[in-house]
Regions:
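Active-site helix of classical SDR
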Residues: 113, 149, 157
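Residue(s) in the substrate-gating loop at a strand-loop-helix junction
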Residues: 133
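Conserved glycine-rich Rossmann-like NAD(P)H-binding loop of the short-chain dehydrogenase/reductase
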Residues: 24-40
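Alpha-helical segment proximal to the catalytic Tyr-Lys
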Residues: 118, 162-166, 223
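Substrate-binding pocket helix/loop in short-chain dehydrogenase/reductase
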Residues: 89-90, 94-102, 184, 191, ...
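C-terminal substrate-recognition "lid" of short-chain dehydrogenase/reductases
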Residues: 110, 125, 203-232, 237
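Conserved glycine-rich cofactor-binding loop
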Residues: 10-12
Length: 238
């Protein structure tokens, strides 16, 4: 049984992650920001512990990680799934949009990894799994700011893997494609159908697709895998 902290646990992919790790027999704490009712429901369903936090605030992250470690008795696995999207033409993207994306997608990952690393270094081991995006690899029109933040997550994954590897800590990034979650509710049925047709396997992804890889990367079988950015995109970003 692993002690797992999942950020952004009340969101689409996050819900799938919480369910999967709980079904795997692991002890789970997850964070949420504003969706209290969803967090309560997920906690009741899975038995996982929910903690409210604004992960763009470094002080809140420090307190949250400390609380999670106390609840779990340490942290073996961090899965950082918190984040937001923004679909806009580049010249219409505001400073506020940019700042919000940086805060939610990149700063939050930096803060979470930094605080959890302090615990894992003391334990002489651990697994960090960051949820990026295929757009961090290939870029997306009308999602320039989002793509840039996810490219930052990609770079941080690789740098952290080099620094933390000698201490027994692996760091990997999962890069989902178009996943059928509330984050992509901005797409109408026709757009979703077109995206599915553009995906070689012929469908959109599910949170369960992402969670399956996270479970593997957290397992003992993945101990020699680090610094990797693995696509779960149905072949979209080939």
């Amino acid at each position: 049984m692993k002690k797992v902290l999942i950020t952004g646990g009340s969101g689409g992919i996050g819900v799938g992650l919480v369910r999967a790790f709980c079904q795997n027999g692991d002890k789970v704490v997850f964070t949420y920001h504003k969706n209290l009712e969803a967090a309560k429901a997920l906690s009741a369903e899975t038995g996982a512990t929910a903690l409210c936090a604004d992960l763009g605030d470094s002080e809140q992250v420090s307190l949250t990680v400390r609380s999670a470690a106390e609840t779990l008795g340490g942290i073996d696995v961090l899965v950082h799934a918190a984040g937001i999207a923004c679909v806009k033409l580049f010249d219409m993207t505001t400073d506020a949009d940019w700042d919000a994306l940086l805060r939610a997608n990149l700063s939050s990952a930096f803060y979470a990894c930094r605080e959890v690393s302090k615990i894992m270094l003391g334990q002489h081991g651990g697994r960090m799994i960051l949820i990026g995006s295929m757009w961090g690899k290939v870029g997306a029109s009308c999602e320039v700011a989002y793509s840039a933040t996810k490219a930052g997550v990609r770079g941080m994954t690789q740098a952290l893997a080099k620094e933390l590897g000698p201490s027994g800590i692996t760091v990997n990034c999962i890069e989902p494609g178009v996943i059928d979650t509330p984050m992509n509710a901005c797409f109408d049925a026709d757009t979703k159908r077109e995206l599915a047709e553009q995906t070689p396997v012929g469908r959109l992804g599910t949170p369960e697709d992402v969670a399956a890889l996270a479970i593997f990367l957290a397992s003992d079988a993945a101990s020699f895998i680090t610094g990797q950015c693995v696509g779960v995109d149905g072949g979209f970003a080939i």
